[in-house]
Design a protein with these regions (language model features):
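Non-catalytic substrate-recognition and accessory regions of acyl/acetyltransferase enzymes
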Residues: 1-132
Length: 133
C-alpha cells in the first residue's frame, strides 16, 4: 500500500479573491460573498463582506476563498476563507549580533540612516468557516 492510497482524495479548492474578481467581476463576487455566514464571529463575516475586496484591490492583504467541489466538478460550495497580511517588523542594528545581521540582510532591507532592518512577516489575518450550509 502506498501513501496516496491512505490519504483520501480531497475535493477542496482555493481561489484567490483577486483572480475571482478578474474572472467574474465585482458584482458576482459580492453575490458569492453574501452567502457567507459566521454567527460565532461577526467580525470575520463583516471583514469578508465589507473589506476583503477593497483590501485585495489595494494589496493590503490577500484573501483566498475555499470551496468544496463535487467529484465531477460541476458544483462548488463556498465553505470558508482565509486572509494573509504582512506586518513590517523593524529591528535596530545595535540590538543584534553580526551573525543575526547577516541573516537579516538576506530577508530584509537595511536603512543606513536609521541603522535598522525592516522585514515583512506574513500572518493569517482572518480565518473563517461558512456556517450557512
Amino acid at each position: 500500500m502506498n501513501l496516496s492510497e491512505l490519504i483520501p482524495e480531497t475535493h477542496y479548492i482555493q481561489i484567490n479573491l483577486s483572480d475571482l474578481l478578474d474572472q467574474l467581476g465585482e458584482d458576482e463576487v459580492k453575490e458569492i460573498l453574501s452567502t457567507f455566514s459566521c454567527p460565532i464571529n461577526a467580525d470575520v463575516e463583516k471583514f469578508l463582506k465589507e473589506k476583503a475586496i477593497e483590501f485585495s484591490k489595494r494589496e493590503f492583504s490577500k484573501t483566498h476563498l475555499v470551496f468544496w467541489e463535487t467529484e465531477n466538478k460541476e458544483e462548488k460550495e463556498f465553505v470558508g476563507y482565509y486572509t494573509i497580511a504582512y506586518k513590517h517588523i523593524t529591528i535596530d542594528r545595535k540590538a543584534i549580533n553580526y551573525k543575526e545581521a547577516r541573516k537579516l540582510r538576506e530577508h530584509g532591507i537595511y536603512n543606513e540612516k536609521s541603522s535598522t532592518y525592516t522585514i515583512a512577516a506574513p500572518f493569517i489575518a482572518q480565518l473563517g468557516k461558512n456556517f450557512s450550509n
